[in-house]
Amino acid sequence: MLSASENRFEIDLDLVFHSYQDAHLINNIFFNNEALWRSNLKVWIDYVRRNDNYLCPAIVRSVNCLSIGLQFTDDKSIMKINQQWRAKEEPTDVLSFPVIDQDSIAPPPNHFLELGDIIVSVQTAQKQADENNHSLDKELCWLVSHGLLHLLGWDHLNEHSLDQMLSFQDKLLQINHDSQIAVSRGLQP
């Protein structure tokens, strides 16, 4: 396992961020903090890229300019998207739409590689946070990290692959937690 300071890649992340339209109804500023989400995603991508044991397309390891769309929405909106793209007439917690695959071609130097889009229902996230007795912040991190792994080619077609993916999400959230502690103490993550 690599330490946080080894093999650092300087990632330039273009985050196309769409905040939750009803943010004023929820007493939480975390999910509308674009800078925080950019930081979280960069830490997670950096960890995946520099560790050869984890699934990550070679193209993602080879470029430093990456772009992700992140949108927070409500159950009604995500249900429409879920119906359109997955033929499921129900809200879901997170949807991801990967753009790259193993055959993708690297963009020209200093151009961004589009990874895809992550869409999260804040309403479903709040319900799941309540059910699991943890914060909305933690649930949103869980869902966004799950969506990111799908953008990087992870999938859960069976229980074993789901367990692996969920275990890796735990690692990403722990790395994120450790980085936030380091920053709060004035240390470089």
UniProtKB/Swiss-Prot annotation:
Descriptive protein name: Endoribonuclease YbeY
Organism: Prochlorococcus marinus (strain MIT 9211)
Top-level EC class: hydrolase
Species classification: Bacteria, Bacillati, Cyanobacteriota, Cyanophyceae, Synechococcales
GO terms classed as biological process: rRNA processing
MF terms in GO: metalloendopeptidase activity; RNA endonuclease activity; zinc ion binding
Binding site residues for Zn(2+): H146, H150, H156
Names of the cofactor(s): Zn(2+)
EC number: 3.1.-.-
InterPro entries linked: MetalPrtase_cat_dom_sf_prd, YbeY, YbeY_CS
Function: Single strand-specific metallo-endoribonuclease involved in late-stage 70S ribosome quality control and in maturation of the 3' terminus of the 16S rRNA.
Gene: ybeY
Principal localisation: cytoplasm
